């Protein structure tokens, strides 16, 4: 049975349901919109392209993303952002990191007091701000959260058993999201570490590119395991430097998201890496994908930030050297393997069993 269509807002279950907004017409936004509709909610999925919206209304399928997935009747594709924001209290923001600020800044006054939950796993290039931090800057009176985890959009849409994390210091927002999304195939856990959960989701995209390259080059299971494990160490080291809780990275939004993104051909960033491993240029790999691969943009800003704050991230530096500095894969592998080994796990005692 679908969940009750009651929404938990301001600490109370409301008897009159308001529609829920999903901002963005991509694959993940579409999957979340369908989840909400399956749970009995009326959903307004906003997108900029009128042709895309019309195709969804007529054919009940997103023509660009998630082909073959029928969009439920409870989802209405719309193009009027002002009207959508005025009608909805709970808004899931699934806009590309490069567009989020531009799209929402013009409607800042309408965001005050609303629950804004970012679904975007990216970092703004100019400021190194995460998406929830941009939302906070645009709408300081809004209630902010993030949703992140091992969540491949097509698998969610096909009802594979899936779990995710909603993170916010606002406990009532977490309850509202859990009430709206939790269903027979989708489980929602809560966390107060918004920064750690969101940073995990953004950073792992870089390592998915590396993992895709390794698979294309048939590097073997030992290599793939090493890459994923050392990626987790790098991510955690950087996140703790920035103020996150290292324990967050042992959960769904850390190691969980990293594993699925680095091991699944359905991952967009993995696909880019695989194409690179096959010999395509970066431009060719991104063009073949036809969708946004946040890891490419994240790599640039993460490399610069790691240097600025003095965090050791050899995998990030190595991938950056291949994609943007003209180094060959063989050169980078040689440098990585000759580097002095550090301790295996940070944040635990290195002095024996004390």
Curated annotation (Swiss-Prot):
Cross-referenced Pfam families: NAD_Gly3P_dh_C, NAD_Gly3P_dh_N
Pathway, per record: Membrane lipid metabolism; glycerophospholipid metabolism
Compartmental location: Cytoplasm
Reactions the enzyme catalyzes: sn-glycerol 3-phosphate + NAD(+) = dihydroxyacetone phosphate + NADH + H(+); sn-glycerol 3-phosphate + NADP(+) = dihydroxyacetone phosphate + NADPH + H(+)
Active site: 204
One GO cellular component term: cytosol
Residues involved in sn-glycerol 3-phosphate binding: 121, 149, 204, 257, 267-269
Keywords (A to Z) from UniProt: Cytoplasm, Lipid biosynthesis, Lipid metabolism, NAD, NADP, Nucleotide-binding, Oxidoreductase, Phospholipid biosynthesis, Phospholipid metabolism
E.C. number(s) listed in UniProt: 1.1.1.94
Binding residues for NADPH: 27-28, 48, 121, 153, 268, 292, 294
Main EC class the enzyme belongs to: oxidoreductase
UniProt-recorded Gene Ontology molecular function terms: glycerol-3-phosphate dehydrogenase [NAD(P)+] activity; NAD binding
InterPro entries, per database record: 6-PGluconate_DH-like_C_sf, 6PGD_dom2, G3P_DH_NAD-dep, G3P_DH_NAD-dep_C, G3P_DH_NAD-dep_N, NAD(P)-bd_dom_sf
Superkingdom of the organism of origin: Bacteria
Example GO biological process: glycerophospholipid biosynthetic process
PROSITE patterns: NAD_G3PDH
PANTHER family: GLYCEROL-3-PHOSPHATE DEHYDROGENASE, GLYCEROL-3-PHOSPHATE DEHYDROGENASE [NAD(+)] 2, CHLOROPLASTIC
Function: Catalyzes the reduction of the glycolytic intermediate dihydroxyacetone phosphate (DHAP) to sn-glycerol 3-phosphate (G3P), the key precursor for phospholipid synthesis.
Family affiliation: Belongs to the NAD-dependent glycerol-3-phosphate dehydrogenase family.
HAMAP family the record matches: NAD_Glyc3P_dehydrog
Protein's name in the database: Glycerol-3-phosphate dehydrogenase [NAD(P)+]
Organism: Pseudomonas fluorescens (strain Pf0-1)
């Amino acid at each position: 049975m679908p969940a009750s269509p009651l929404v938990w807002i301001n600490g109370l279950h409301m008897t009159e349901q308001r529609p829920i907004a999903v901002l963005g017409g991509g694959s993940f936004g579409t999957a979340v919109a369908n989840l909400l509709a399956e749970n009995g909610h009326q959903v307004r999925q906003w997108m900029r392209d009128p042709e895309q919206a019309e195709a969804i209304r007529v054919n009940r399928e997103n023509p660009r993303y998630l082909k073959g997935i029928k969009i439920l009747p409870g989802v209405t594709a719309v193009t009027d952002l002002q009207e959508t924001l005025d009608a909805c209290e709970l808004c899931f923001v699934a806009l590309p990191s490069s567009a989020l600020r531009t799209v929402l800044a013009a409607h800042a006054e309408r965001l005050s007091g609303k629950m804004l939950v970012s679904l975007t796993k990216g970092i703004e290039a100019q400021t190194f701000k995460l998406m929830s931090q941009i939302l906070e800057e645009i709408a300081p009176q809004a209630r902010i959260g993030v949703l992140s985890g091992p969540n491949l959009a097509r698998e969610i849409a096909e009802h594979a058993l899936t779990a995710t994390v909603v993170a916010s210091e606002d406990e009532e927002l977490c309850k509202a999201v859990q009430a709206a999304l939790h269903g027979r195939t989708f489980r929602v856990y809560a966390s107060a570490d918004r920064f750690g959960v969101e940073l995990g989701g953004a950073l792992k995209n870089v390592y998915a590119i590396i993992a895709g390259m390794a698979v294309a080059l048939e590097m073997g299971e030992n290599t793939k395991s090493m890459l994923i494990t050392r990626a987790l160490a790098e991510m955690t080291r950087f996140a703790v430097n920035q103020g996150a809780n290292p324990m967050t990275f042992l959960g769904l939004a850390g190691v969980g998201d990293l594993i699925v993104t680095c091991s699944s051909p359905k991952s967009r960033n993995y696909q880019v890496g695989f194409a690179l491993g096959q010999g395509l240029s970066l431009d060719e790999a991104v063009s073949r994908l036809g969708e946004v691969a946040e890891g490419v943009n994240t790599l640039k800003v993460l490399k610069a930030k790691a240097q600025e704050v003095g965090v050791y991230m050899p995998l990030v530096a190595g991938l950056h050297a291949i994609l943007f500095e003209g180094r060959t894969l063989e050169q980078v592998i040689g440098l990585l393997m000759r580097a002095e080994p550090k301790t295996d796990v940070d944040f635990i005692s290195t002095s024996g069993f004390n």
